[in-house]
Protein backbone atom coordinates (compact mmCIF):
# COMPACT_ATOMS: atom_id res chain seq x y z
CA UNK A 1 0.00 0.00 0.00
CA UNK A 2 1.36 3.42 -0.84
CA UNK A 3 0.79 6.96 0.33
CA UNK A 4 -2.33 6.93 -1.84
CA UNK A 5 -3.72 4.11 0.30
CA UNK A 6 -3.02 6.11 3.43
CA UNK A 7 -4.77 9.22 2.15
CA UNK A 8 -7.63 7.10 0.83
CA UNK A 9 -8.28 5.47 4.19
CA UNK A 10 -7.94 8.79 6.03
CA UNK A 11 -10.52 10.26 3.66
CA UNK A 12 -12.77 7.23 4.10
CA UNK A 13 -12.43 7.49 7.88
CA UNK A 14 -13.40 11.16 7.93
CA UNK A 15 -16.34 10.72 5.57
CA UNK A 16 -17.49 7.67 7.52
CA UNK A 17 -17.43 9.78 10.69
CA UNK A 18 -19.75 12.27 8.97
CA UNK A 19 -22.18 9.48 8.13
CA UNK A 20 -21.98 8.17 11.71
CA UNK A 21 -22.73 11.63 13.10
CA UNK A 22 -25.69 11.87 10.73
CA UNK A 23 -27.08 8.55 12.00
CA UNK A 24 -26.59 9.64 15.62
CA UNK A 25 -28.49 12.83 14.81
CA UNK A 26 -31.32 10.78 13.28
CA UNK A 27 -31.42 8.56 16.37
CA UNK A 28 -31.70 11.60 18.63
CA UNK A 29 -34.47 13.05 16.46
CA UNK A 30 -36.46 9.81 16.55
CA UNK A 31 -36.09 9.69 20.33
CA UNK A 32 -37.24 13.30 20.57
CA UNK A 33 -40.30 12.47 18.49
CA UNK A 34 -41.16 9.57 20.79
CA UNK A 35 -40.75 11.79 23.84
CA UNK A 36 -42.84 14.50 22.12
CA UNK A 37 -40.06 17.10 22.24
CA UNK A 38 -40.37 17.66 18.49
CA UNK A 39 -43.35 17.50 16.17
CA UNK A 40 -43.53 15.19 13.18
CA UNK A 41 -43.34 17.98 10.60
CA UNK A 42 -40.10 19.34 12.05
CA UNK A 43 -38.60 15.85 12.28
CA UNK A 44 -39.42 15.10 8.65
CA UNK A 45 -37.92 18.41 7.53
CA UNK A 46 -34.68 17.72 9.37
CA UNK A 47 -34.35 14.07 8.35
CA UNK A 48 -35.35 14.63 4.72
CA UNK A 49 -32.79 17.41 4.40
CA UNK A 50 -29.97 14.98 5.28
CA UNK A 51 -31.15 11.66 3.84
CA UNK A 52 -29.98 12.25 0.26
CA UNK A 53 -26.58 13.74 1.24
CA UNK A 54 -25.99 10.72 3.47
CA UNK A 55 -26.68 8.37 0.55
CA UNK A 56 -24.48 10.44 -1.78
CA UNK A 57 -21.66 10.42 0.76
CA UNK A 58 -21.88 6.63 1.08
CA UNK A 59 -21.84 6.29 -2.71
CA UNK A 60 -18.82 8.60 -2.92
CA UNK A 61 -16.90 6.55 -0.33
CA UNK A 62 -17.73 3.36 -2.21
CA UNK A 63 -16.68 4.89 -5.54
CA UNK A 64 -13.37 6.06 -4.06
CA UNK A 65 -12.46 2.54 -3.04
CA UNK A 66 -13.76 1.02 -6.28
CA UNK A 67 -11.77 3.33 -8.54
CA UNK A 68 -8.60 2.88 -6.50
CA UNK A 69 -8.79 -0.92 -6.70
CA UNK A 70 -9.73 -1.75 -3.13
CA UNK A 71 -12.29 -4.38 -4.09
CA UNK A 72 -12.76 -5.89 -0.64
CA UNK A 73 -13.47 -2.52 0.94
CA UNK A 74 -15.86 -1.70 -1.88
CA UNK A 75 -17.67 -5.01 -1.36
CA UNK A 76 -18.01 -4.22 2.35
CA UNK A 77 -19.84 -1.02 1.41
CA UNK A 78 -22.10 -2.58 -1.24
CA UNK A 79 -24.99 -3.64 1.08
CA UNK A 80 -25.58 -0.14 2.46
CA UNK A 81 -24.93 1.38 -0.96
CA UNK A 82 -27.52 -0.94 -2.53
CA UNK A 83 -30.02 -0.26 0.26
CA UNK A 84 -29.65 3.51 -0.12
CA UNK A 85 -29.89 3.27 -3.92
CA UNK A 86 -33.02 1.13 -3.60
CA UNK A 87 -34.65 3.65 -1.28
CA UNK A 88 -33.86 6.56 -3.59
CA UNK A 89 -34.97 4.62 -6.69
CA UNK A 90 -38.29 3.63 -5.07
CA UNK A 91 -38.69 7.16 -3.66
CA UNK A 92 -39.07 5.88 -0.11
CA UNK A 93 -36.09 7.83 1.22
CA UNK A 94 -38.23 10.82 2.23
CA UNK A 95 -40.38 10.70 5.34
CA UNK A 96 -43.96 11.90 5.43
CA UNK A 97 -45.20 13.73 8.52
CA UNK A 98 -48.58 11.99 8.39
CA UNK A 99 -46.96 8.55 8.15
CA UNK A 100 -44.01 8.84 10.51
CA UNK A 101 -45.66 7.41 13.62
CA UNK A 102 -46.50 4.18 11.78
CA UNK A 103 -42.96 3.90 10.43
CA UNK A 104 -41.09 5.13 13.50
CA UNK A 105 -40.08 1.68 14.74
CA UNK A 106 -38.77 0.65 11.33
CA UNK A 107 -36.93 3.97 10.94
CA UNK A 108 -35.24 3.55 14.32
CA UNK A 109 -34.16 -0.02 13.51
CA UNK A 110 -32.79 1.12 10.15
CA UNK A 111 -30.94 3.94 11.88
CA UNK A 112 -29.41 1.61 14.50
CA UNK A 113 -28.35 -0.91 11.85
CA UNK A 114 -26.70 1.77 9.74
CA UNK A 115 -25.01 3.21 12.81
CA UNK A 116 -23.69 -0.24 13.71
CA UNK A 117 -22.41 -0.70 10.17
CA UNK A 118 -20.70 2.70 10.18
CA UNK A 119 -19.06 1.98 13.53
CA UNK A 120 -17.73 -1.40 12.36
CA UNK A 121 -16.46 0.09 9.13
CA UNK A 122 -14.89 2.96 11.12
CA UNK A 123 -12.69 0.52 13.01
CA UNK A 124 -11.85 -1.32 9.79
CA UNK A 125 -10.81 1.94 8.10
CA UNK A 126 -8.84 2.91 11.18
CA UNK A 127 -7.00 -0.42 11.17
CA UNK A 128 -6.22 -0.12 7.46
CA UNK A 129 -5.08 3.47 7.95
CA UNK A 130 -2.66 2.41 10.69
CA UNK A 131 -1.30 -0.47 8.60
CA UNK A 132 -0.85 1.89 5.63
CA UNK A 133 0.95 4.34 7.90
CA UNK A 134 3.27 1.63 9.21
CA UNK A 135 3.99 0.38 5.69
CA UNK A 136 4.66 3.93 4.57
CA UNK A 137 7.12 4.42 7.46
CA UNK A 138 8.82 1.11 6.68
CA UNK A 139 9.27 2.19 3.06
CA UNK A 140 10.78 5.50 4.16
CA UNK A 141 13.28 3.80 6.47
CA UNK A 142 14.53 1.30 3.87
From Swiss-Prot:
InterPro entries with a match to the protein in the record: Cornichon, Cornichon_conserved
GO MF terms held by the record: signaling receptor binding
Pfam families (alphabetical): Cornichon (PF03311)
Transmembrane segments: 8-28, 56-76, 115-135
GO biological process, one term: endoplasmic reticulum to Golgi vesicle-mediated transport
Residue numbers on the Cytoplasmic membrane side: 1-7, 77-114
Positions in the Extracellular compartment: 29-55, 136-142
Cellular localisation: Membrane
Keywords: Membrane, Transmembrane, Transmembrane helix
Bilayer topology annotation: Multi-pass membrane protein
Gene Ontology cellular-component terms listed: COPII-coated ER to Golgi transport vesicle; endoplasmic reticulum; endoplasmic reticulum membrane
Signal sequence residues: none
Keyword Signal in record: no
Assigned protein family: Belongs to the cornichon family.
Identification of the protein by name: ER-derived vesicles protein ERV15
Amino acid sequence: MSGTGLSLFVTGLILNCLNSICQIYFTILYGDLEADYINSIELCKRVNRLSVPEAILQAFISALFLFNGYWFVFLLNVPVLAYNASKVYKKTHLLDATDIFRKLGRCKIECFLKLGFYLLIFFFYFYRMVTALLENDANLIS
